[in-house]
Amino acid sequence: MKLILTADVDNLGAPGDTVEVKDGYGRNYLLPRGLAIVATRGAEKQVEGIRRAQEARAVRGLDHAKELKDAIEGLESISLTVKTAGDSGKLFGSVTAADVAAAIKAAGGPVVDKRSLELPKAHIKATGKHAIVVNLHPDVVAKFHLNVVGA
C-alpha cells in the first residue's frame, strides 16, 4: 500500500514522505490514527502544503539561527505570570513549551517553534527561575532564564 505520511512516524519517515507499507499496517494503524493518507493525485497537493508548513517553521540556515540566538539572549528578562496554589509556589497546572514560546514572543523576541525548546523537565510546575534551552540549529543553541511568577 502506497501512503503519504502526515506526521513523523518512527522508523518510517517524516511528514510528506511517500512510503510503501504492508496493507494491514496502513489500514489498521497509520490511516485510522491520521498518520498517513492514501497516495493519490489530490494527496500530492496536501504534501505540498505539509512541506510549505515545514519550511516556514524551519530556521533558514546557520546565519539566521545565529541572529535568532542573539535576539533571544539579548532580551532583558523573560517572565511568565501564572496562577499559583497558595503561597507554596506550586502552580495550577504547568508551564509548557508552547507557553514559553508565547512568553518569548511577548517579551519582544522572535517567534520560536515550541518543539525546539528544552524545558528542565517535561513541564515547569513551580515558580522561580528556570533554565531554558532553544535548539535553533544543530550547531546553534540559545540559553536563557525564564522567570515564572505567581499571580
UniProtKB/Swiss-Prot annotation:
Record SUPFAM superfamilies: L9 N-domain-like, Ribosomal protein L9 C-domain
PROSITE patterns: RIBOSOMAL_L9 (PS00651)
Family (UniProt): Belongs to the bacterial ribosomal protein bL9 family.
Domain of life: Bacteria
Record-linked Pfam families: Ribosomal_L9_C, Ribosomal_L9_N
Protein name, per record: Large ribosomal subunit protein bL9
InterPro entries assigned to the protein according to its UniProt record, in alphabetical order: Ribosomal_bL9, Ribosomal_bL9/RNase_H1_N, Ribosomal_bL9_bac/chp, Ribosomal_bL9_C, Ribosomal_bL9_C_sf, Ribosomal_bL9_N, Ribosomal_bL9_N_sf
GO terms (BP aspect): translation
Any single Gene Ontology cellular-component annotation: ribonucleoprotein complex
One annotated GO molecular function: structural constituent of ribosome
Swiss-Prot/TrEMBL keywords: Ribonucleoprotein, Ribosomal protein, RNA-binding, rRNA-binding
Purpose: Binds to the 23S rRNA.
